[in-house]
Structures are given as structure tokens and as C-alpha cells.
Amino acid sequence: MDFGITFPSYIRAYHDVKMAEEYGFTHAWFYDSQMCYSDVYATMALAAEHSRYIKLGTLVSILGNRIAPVTAHSIATINELAPGRVILGVGSGFT
């Protein structure tokens, strides 16, 4: 059985992701709320560097806030740090 946990995208969330991984969580999800938290992709990159197996995903990346190539490049970069552990959740946001 898989268990996920959601975090606000604050830059030090990698500490919490590392702890979640130690407690057996399989997924860590991050809000993409640019006005409230740090950048979701910077947060995920740090989490990728400080974890080993937990999957990392956006919950959700708001398509209207960034042009598609920027989103694709950001998520591809994180996938280089954590191959096969990255999930891009997309949506309109604010729902």
C-alpha cells in the first residue's frame, strides 16, 4: 500500500520529506502556490537531493502561471536529480 503526504512548498521542506521517507511514506506532494510559498520546483529539487526513494510531485502545477516550456524544463531538471521519482500534476489551480 502506498501512502503520500502533502507539504507547502517552503524551501526547508526537504527536512520533512526526509523524515516522511524514514517513516515509510511513498509520495511527497507540494503545493504550487506562488503567492504563499517558495517556488515548487526549487523545493522539489532540494527534496530530491535529500531523499532516496520517495516520489515527488506537484499538487498541482498551475498551467496558467508558467509557459509550458518552462514547466517542462523545470520538471525534467528535477527528474535528472531523482530519476523515475517525479510526478507532474497539472491543473487550473485555485479550485
PLM region spans:
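Glycine-rich "substrate-gating" loop/helix at the edge of Rossmann-like oxidoreductase active sites
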Residues: 34-35, 61-67
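Flexible, glycine-rich active-site loops centered on histidine and acidic residues
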Residues: 1-8, 65-95
